[in-house]
Amino acid sequence: EYRKSMQGKIMKGVGGFYYIHPHNTVNTIYECKAKGAFRNQKIKPAVGDDVEIEIISEQDKTGNIVEILPRENLLIRPAVANVDQAVIVFALADPKPNYNLLDRFLIMMGQQGVETLICFNKSDLVSGQEAKEICDIYAGAGYQVFLTVAKENVGVDAFREAIRGKTSVFAGPSGVGKSSMLNALH
């Protein structure tokens, strides 16, 4: 039997289900499973993948992923594909920044050819001089660096402009303010 197919982007993946937003639609999401062929090939769909789906039920908005279209890039941690840029969020204090980890993130993104922005959050917890010195190091290495206090909306507007219209993945250690930053952007 012939099933209607369409292309879309994976917006979320939870427990073997993938939520696909079809191209050229507004506010439509299909819940899909990946065909067994992907498991046999040890390929796993990732958030951000452009995929071909076949519709099982138009009414229930369910389908199967039948093809993963060519990827521009693929990040392993977090597992996400076809991003325009990565945003690495670190706190300048509380928790104290692990610059070794930050540098590893930057190297990993660079190896994938992903443009990377650095957002130093909680910049109110250190002196202006210390914040400037840290920013100068990474800006001097060619990165766009932002100082923010997400909970007080400080520095958020400039940061919002830098990510506007781009598919961005946020990464960083626990407790640095990634969720606060995403909330401040809304």
Label each PLM-derived region with a short phrase:
Residues 100-110, 115:
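Histidine-anchored nucleotide/phosphate-binding helix
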Residues 179-186:
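A conserved segment at the C-terminal end of the G1
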Residues 48, 109, 121:
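Residue-level signal for inorganic ion chemistry
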Residues 83-90, 112-121, 143-147:
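Conserved beta-strand/loop subsegment of P-loop NTPase cores
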Residues 1-99:
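N-terminal accessory targeting/assembly segments
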Residues 125-176:
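Canonical P-loop GTPase G-domain recognition
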Residues 12-14, 59, 82, 110-114, ...:
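Short flexible coil/turn linkers enriched for glycine and charged/polar residues
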Residues 11, 15, 70, 106-110, ...:
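Signal for well-folded cores of large energy- and translation-related assemblies
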